[in-house]
């Protein structure tokens, strides 16, 4: 196996891991919105986007940019954190 194919395989593994984590975050945000009985319209208005776009985010048709994802979290009063595997940062 060449170095280029090792990098390609590694890159695919990273992308799959990130997609899984991303899906997990979106799923939790949707669950929180529903548990709190908040409408998509309310969340979209707070973020400053169209309701249709929030629906696309929730169905994972379109991925929100990091800024919008953070605004979504802020609206639900939850926060994303950054950490390392060893717990140090």
PLM features per residue range, with description:
Residues 83-89:
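Short amphipathic recognition helices of helix-turn-helix/homeodomain-type DNA-binding modules
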Residues 2-35:
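A short, Lys/Arg-rich alpha-helix, primarily the initiator
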Residues 48-64:
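Recognition helix of helix-turn-helix/homeodomain-like DNA-binding domains
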Residues 27-46, 71:
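Short basic helix-loop element that most often maps to the first helix and adjoining turn
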Residues 65-82:
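DNA major-groove recognition helix of helix-turn-helix/homeodomain DNA-binding modules
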Residues 29, 43-44, 54-57, 83:
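Conserved hydrophobic/aromatic packing and binding residues within compact polymer-binding modules
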């Amino acid at each position: 196996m060449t170095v280029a194919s090792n990098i390609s395989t590694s890159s695919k593994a990273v992308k799959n891991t990130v997609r899984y984590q991303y899906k997990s975050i979106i799923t939790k945000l949707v669950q929180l919105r529903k548990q709190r009985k908040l409408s998509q319209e309310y969340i979209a208005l707070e973020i400053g986007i169209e309701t249709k776009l929030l629906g696309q985010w929730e169905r994972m048709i379109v991925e929100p940019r990091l800024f919008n994802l953070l605004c979504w979290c802020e609206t639900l009063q939850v926060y994303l954190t950054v950490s390392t595997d060893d717990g140090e940062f």
